[in-house]
Amino acid sequence: MSLLKITDITRKYKLGQVQVTALGGVSLSIENGEYVSIMGPSGSGKSTLLNIIGCLDLPTTGTYIFGGKHIESLKDGELADIRNQQIGFVFQQFHLLPNLTALENVELPLIYQGVWGRERGERAKAALESVGLGDRIHHLPFQMSGGEQQRVAISRAIVGNPSLILADEPTGALDSKSSENIMEIFQRLNHELGITIVQVTHERDVALYGQKVYHLRDGEIEHIETLNSQGGN
């Protein structure tokens, strides 16, 4: 069953008197439980497409159905509810609040969801333990390595039990060992919890952890690659 379906979407911007087409008629369908990558050179439309999938932006034309809802027809508040309740975001930069502990950073989405008291703390702690950070819950970001900070960011993304995780260059700021660790976590979340994952990456090794690769060029899908195995194993 499709979690999301995009049909012939475009995204156009005005830069002064010039109209820029970031996406030019993109169509794709992603099933529940799939792990897919979006690859392409700079300026190919990868981040624009991810922003639309994540309800951070809307297409100029075309349709986008997520969880049975026509996203392009929703109001800002309805889009915010979908982002908060159904989508987890992981970025290249960790975006952790520096004056909050790992636990407090992970609790933030639950505050917005109206989860209070002991339940909020227990869920945040469980999310951190699931990525191997049970002994770092009271550490501040500056007391952790880059890989550990990205694991906190992943915990924050999954603590609300989303159906979809969107990752934009999630290993871009990490060394090779930390990158491998992060990708193994994503793969486990996909395999064991059935979370759908869509990631943007420039790195072939990272894309190999998924099941399918959408190759973008000049705002269009150039071809779709189906992978036989995951993680290069």
Each model region followed by its residue ranges:
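ABC family nucleotide-binding domain
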Residues: L3-L216
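H-loop (His-switch) and adjacent beta-strand-loop-beta switch element
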Residues: V213-E225
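ABC-family P-loop ATPase nucleotide-binding domain
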Residues: M1-K12, E222-N233
